[in-house]
Amino acid sequence: MEMKRTIATAILVAVLAISCLSRNPTIEAYRNHFYSINFMDVETLSVKLTTEQIDISRNEKRMLKDGDILVYLTDEDRLGKMVILELDKNESGMLLFDFVTYDKDGKVFIEKKDVKFNSSYVFDFDKGIFPKEIEGVKLWWHSIDDIEMYLVPWAPTKLLKYPNAEMN
């Protein structure tokens, strides 16, 4: 009887350990901060949005890191936010992010998690897709070469790094 209890305890401990390892506490912290930012916060920053590209090069010029949050305005005049979960980890050429696009009343229009945005692709925040056609594109990951890269909002889309979004 004691042996069965010991084995059951060992199995329970192993299952709990595996469960804890499967969750990334850093990503959860990024998401918690991301979801603490509401539509009013995004709307307040909307006057500062710009069409300037954001440097994500593989050097000291990089302006973004994991956990950073961007606020955006789409070409369909919707505000939104995105959180960077992983940016070019191990030089993968991939950006992993979550995003929320709001309608004009501040209600969630579209929301997706764990979006994998590859280098040289474009993304549409109004539809939550990587469009086949360039028309209506919202954000482009522009790779000049293996080092120099930018996130480029295509006008009239605008972007802004959320202030004090550092989580690292």
Model segments located where?
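Hydrophobic helical h-region of N-terminal Sec-dependent signal peptides
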Residues: 8-17
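Positively charged n-region of N-terminal signal peptides that target proteins for export
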Residues: 1-6
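Generic detector of short alpha-helix boundary/capping microenvironments
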Residues: 7-8, 72
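Surface-exposed, beta-sheet-biased, low-hydrophobicity segments with strongly acidic/polar composition
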Residues: 20-168
